[in-house]
């Protein structure tokens, strides 16, 4: 068993893949403990580790294999001299063979079993959620739930209201293990776990959408089947720190670290809404990320009002007509407004390394010709990363942001396939997708990034990493991880509000790496 700490890549398997691995694991279990027995032991050990002096361990058990894991855990806790109570959902139901055997063992040991929720708990008690796990079936808001589903929702709500700390077994009940969405989308009822012990595999839904909030501190027990994971292609992989950069040579010069040009920042004269700050933030991020030269190109370039002075003296200003699109990396769209539409055809056709953000994506979503130009870039060996938030992704997919959020992994993969580029779908558990690559879910970042301008910072950082020689996919993975890590470190030190400007200043470049 290990506590997940995001410092190394981790394969993520969806429910179908986990079932496949479970079958492989069961096939090789002979006279030793069953997978359920191993799972129950792991749950009991973790329960004791996180709450060693709990007055009582309440084990809430559903009718399936997840409930069986909980029953096995109850047996161990009882045998170790702890006060244990089992709350059994619909005891009259027929249970899987292993779970029925575990229930018989619970009864034989004289462990207290009840079929109704307790009215109240000691605040120091520990609840073990073994109700659903990955056995969750999706319930759409418009469908009529069955009596069993209604009862389970009542249990989930009841356990939530009891207020004691919860250890979830595999996946918090009410959370979809594949998508990180809630089973009941109309009311969002789910278990809010303090800890989650994932069993056999790590699941993508625990790291994106609502997963990170619902799971709390995450642990993994592979039940001795880690070697079997190599036989199944994962649904995704957890992002990890980028590969270490080489020590810069003493003879390096500013050209050694790449050029980045930021195109955007629509003038206030056009629509009464100046957005030059978006370019300044992206430029600051690129500069602090170690780019050798950073240029700002404010739009429209033929307007006197576009002669905005960059906030940082180190950032050079360029007229769009004078910009060499084939050199370095181009970041296009940050605060671009309507003006970005005029420069996009040239940017899409000529730039070699390109990051498209914000208004550039909105323009492409409205114009089939621009969309085709974007698709053609891959055939010309031109490299593109797009960085939509859910609403921008929805516009590109001609759907709603709700549908995008319902399955973030699928949405990002669909966009990558359609537009022939690397996609960074921003949000909790940012998804990075590219055709022919295993999709990546990012574990870093927090709500401090939910403020204006942080997306511009990410775009500038991404441009710098591309300019420094990383491939489009590598640059996306590295930038997203670093971007989130800065916000996580800020929370650790409990500093004041994190602004986008401060976020950009805290990014580090390869020249500052320790060696």
Predicted regions and their residues:
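Internal gly/pro-rich beta-alpha loop/helix module
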Residues: 125-126, 131-233
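Small-residue (G/A/S/T)-rich helix-start motifs and N-terminal tracts that mark the onset
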Residues: 1-90, 95-96, 100, 193-195, ...
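N-terminal small/polar loop signature for handling phosphorylated ligands or for N-terminal nucleophile
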Residues: 72-160, 305-323
């Amino acid at each position: 068993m290990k506590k997940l700490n995001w410092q190394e890549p981790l394969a993520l398997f969806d429910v179908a893949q986990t079932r496949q691995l479970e079958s492989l694991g069961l096939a090789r279990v002979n006279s030793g403990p069953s997978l359920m027995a191993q799972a129950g032991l792991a749950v009991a050990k973790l329960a004791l580790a996180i709450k060693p002096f709990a007055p009582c361990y309440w084990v809430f058990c559903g009718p399936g294999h997840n409930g069986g894991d909980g029953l096995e855990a109850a047996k161990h806790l009882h045998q170790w001299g702890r006060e244990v109570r089992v709350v059994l959902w619909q005891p009259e139901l027929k249970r899987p063979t292993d779970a029925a055997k575990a229930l018989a063992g619970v009864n034989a040991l004289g462990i207290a079993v009840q079929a109704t929720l307790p009215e109240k708990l000691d605040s120091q008690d520990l609840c073990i959620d073994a109700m659903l796990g990955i056995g969750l079936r999706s319930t759409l808001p418009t469908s009529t739930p069955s009596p069993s589903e209604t009862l389970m929702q009542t249990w989930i709500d009841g356990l939530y209201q009891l207020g004691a700390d919860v250890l979830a077994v595999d996946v918090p009940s009410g959370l979809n293990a594949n998508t990180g969405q809630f089973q009941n989308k109309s009311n969002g009822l789910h278990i809010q776990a303090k800890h989650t012990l994932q069993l056999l595999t790590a699941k993508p839904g625990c790291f994106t959408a609502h997963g990170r909030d619902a799971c709390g501190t995450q642990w993994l027990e592979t039940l001795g089947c880690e070697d079997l994971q190599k036989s199944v292609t994962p649904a995704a992989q957890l992002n990890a720190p980028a590969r270490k950069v080489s020590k810069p040579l003493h003879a390096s010069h500013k050209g050694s670290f790449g050029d980045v040009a930021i195109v955007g920042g629509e003038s206030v004269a056009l629509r009464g809404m100046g957005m030059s700050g978006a370019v300044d933030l992206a430029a600051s991020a690129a500069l602090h990320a170690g780019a050798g030269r950073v240029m700002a190109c404010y739009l429209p370039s033929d307007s006197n009002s576009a002669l905005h002075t960059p906030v940082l003296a180190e950032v050079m200003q360029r007229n769009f007509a004078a910009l060499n699109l084939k050199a370095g990396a181009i970041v296009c769209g940050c605060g671009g407004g309507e003006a970005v539409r005029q420069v996009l055809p040239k940017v899409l056709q000529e730039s070699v390394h390109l990051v498209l953000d914000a208004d550039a994506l909105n323009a492409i979503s409205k114009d089939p010709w621009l969309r085709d130009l974007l698709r053609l870039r891959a055939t010309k060996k031109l490299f593109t990363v797009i960085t939509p938030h859910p609403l921008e992704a929805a516009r590109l997919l001609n759907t709603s942001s709700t549908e995008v959020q319902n399955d973030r992994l699928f949405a990002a993969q669909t966009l990558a396939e359609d537009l022939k580029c690397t996609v960074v779908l921003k949000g909790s558990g940012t998804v990075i997708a590219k055709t022919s690559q295993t999709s990546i879910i990012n574990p870093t970042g927090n709500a401090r990034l939910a403020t204006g301008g942080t997306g511009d910072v990410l775009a500038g950082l991404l441009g710098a990493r591309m300019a420094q020689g990383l491939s489009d996919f590598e640059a996306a993975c590295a930038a997203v991880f670093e971007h989130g890590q800065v916000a996580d470190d800020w929370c650790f030190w409990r500093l004041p509000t994190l602004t986008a400007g401060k976020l950009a200043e805290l990014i580090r470049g390869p020249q500052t790496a320790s060696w």
